[in-house]
Curated annotation (Swiss-Prot):
InterPro entries: MATE_fam (IPR002528), MATE_MdtK (IPR050222), MdtK-like (IPR048279), Multidrug-R_MdtK (IPR022913). GO terms for cellular component: plasma membrane. The lineage of its organism: Bacteria, Pseudomonadati, Pseudomonadota, Gammaproteobacteria, Enterobacterales. It comes from Yersinia pseudotuberculosis serotype O:1b (strain IP 31758). Its main location: membrane. This is Multidrug resistance protein MdtK. It is a multi-pass membrane protein. The chain crosses the membrane at residues 11-31, 46-66, 93-113, 127-147, 160-180, 188-208, 243-263, 283-301, 316-336, 357-377, 387-407, 418-438. Keywords: Antiport, Cell inner membrane, Cell membrane, Ion transport, Membrane, Sodium, Sodium transport, Transmembrane, Transmembrane helix, Transport. Multidrug efflux pump that functions probably as a Na(+)/drug antiporter. It is found in: Cell inner membrane. The keyword Membrane applies.
Length: 457
């Protein structure tokens, strides 16, 4: 029992800074929306429309680079720290390649926005302007993630937390300058949010670069030691590990976007109630997601040490801690669901709808915790292809169709509206959680040599 308690402490020490970093990142989006909304409703809507395209694109790049964390953790655990710098340099090349791809997508985003039904031309113009501004921050954001993944792979999660919080503080005055046109800058409105966010990402990258070159714990990792040409073998291996994670993230984000579109014809009350429940669930999701990052680090590190048994301890402890936290947040959601809904909106019908959906959101949190932490454990084992197949099957082949049947048709029960989609979410996430656990159990039953060889690859 003692080894599980010790492991739980290590996991929480890694996870808490990740939670704070994620909150800072989310708060940046909230600040953008509020400050754009103070100019006009059109500017706020433009930022919202732009963000709906920006998020899937940038999360694809983010997911691709997550392959670095278990790679660095495994090299660190196995005492091969001298090889870390080369992996990270290739991470920069990979980030540069995917940056060009994402920037091309964002540059041509006007074609996507113009296809939206009855979109106001002024809103469309501002949304495109926002995307054309924020796209210059793509390399800065992904370069920052490369160095953040290096630090997290070395079990250093606090730098990401501190720099993320500083980024939030810097974002507010830069937003003010470019939104309202202060200190000689043009008044860009919602487009100014894109300029500010792009600028902040470069500031965050430079701060992280400054940290890794001066941190005593990383003095032996010489990133600046001469020019490193692309190593296509390493980049191919990192891409092979990262691409399934990137696609899984992309499919998850687009799933929620599709559900939002399917709910939209059901009326303002249904849409508002759904959005409140989803927004609050997203906040609660940060807890298991941070444990997922910690699980990747601990499992990767233990496998690097050659300790398959300790990797199992890390995997089971992360799951247990995640379920415990999810149980607490689920009870909190059930007890305070009406009070939470009132924070978002005071309309009685909307509060009633949101309160009803939050009962389902409470159940959703338990399955969500297991599946996202399971994903982190599998990343630690470098078994990322299974993550893609499990999430695609669970979300798109089970969750969405069952949600559609329950929410909008009378085939099974009378159409349930948004509640049907939330039951679909629960079905999909529960399936994902079960499949993740089964996959982890299968992996752990393999011969030790197979597990260690796979992790070292």
């Amino acid at each position: 029992m003692q080894k599980y308690i010790v492991e739980a402490r290590s996991l929480l020490a890694l996870a808490i800074p990740v939670v704070i970093a994620q909150l800072s990142q989310t708060a940046m989006g909230v600040v953008d929306t509020i400050m754009a909304g103070s100019v006009s409703a059109t500017d706020m809507a433009a930022v919202a429309v732009g963000t709906s395209i920006w998020l899937p694109a940038i999360l694809f790049g983010h997911g691709l680079l997550l392959a670095l964390t278990p790679t660095v953790a495994q090299l660190n655990g196995s005492g091969r720290r001298s090889q870390i710098a080369h992996q990270v340099r290739q991470g920069f090349w990979l980030a540069l390649c995917v940056s060009v791809l994402i920037m091309l997508v964002l540059y041509n985003s006007d074609h996507v926005i113009k296809q939206m039904d009855n979109i106001d031309p002024v809103l469309a113009q501002k949304a495109v302007g926002f995307l054309h501004a924020i796209m210059w921050g793509v390399p800065g954001y992904l370069f920052f993630q490369v160095l953040r993944n290096q630090c997290e792979g070395l079990s250093k999660t606090k730098p990401g937390m501190v720099i993320g919080f500083v980024g939030l503080l810097v974002n507010i005055p830069i937003n003010y300058i470019f939104i309202y046109g202060k200190f000689g800058a043009p008044a860009l409105g919602g487009v100014g949010c894109g300029v500010a966010t792009a600028s902040v990402y470069w500031v965050m990258f430079l701060m992280m670069r400054w940290y890794v070159t001066r941190a005593r714990s990383q003095q032996d990792i010489k990133l600046e030691k001469g020019f490193a040409a692309p190593d296509w073998q390493v980049m191919k291996r990192l891409s092979g590990l990262g691409l399934p994670v990137a696609l899984a993230l992309f499919f998850e984000v687009t799933l929620f976007a599709v559900v939002a579109l399917l709910v939209s014809p059901l009326g303002i009350v249904a849409v508002a109630g759904h959005q409140i429940a989803l927004n609050f669930s997203s906040l609660m999701f940060m807890l298991p997601m941070s444990l997922s990052v910690a699980a990747t680090i601990r499992v990767g590190f233990r496998l690097g040490q050659g300790s398959v048994e300790q990797a199992q301890v890390a995997a089971y402890t992360s799951m247990a801690v995640g379920l415990l936290l999810a149980s607490v947040t689920a009870v909190f959601t059930i007890v305070f669901r009406e009070h939470i809904a009132l924070l978002y909106n005071k309309t009685p019908e909307v509060v009633t709808m949101a309160s009803h959906l939050m009962l389902l959101a409470a159940l959703y949190q338990l399955s969500d915790a297991v599946q996202v932490i399971g994903s982190g454990v599998l990343r630690g084992y470098k078994d990322t292809r299974s993550i893609f197949f499990i999430t695609f099957t669970a979300y798109w082949l089970l969750g969405l169709p069952s949600g559609y049947l329950l929410g909008l048709t009378d085939y099974i029960l009378p159409a349930m509206g948004p509640a049907g989609f939330w039951i679909g979410f629960i079905i999909g996430l529960t399936a994902a959680a079960i499949l993740m656990v089964l996959r982890i159990r299968w992996l752990q039953k393999q011969p030790t040599a197979f597990i260690l060889q796979r992790a070292a690859h």
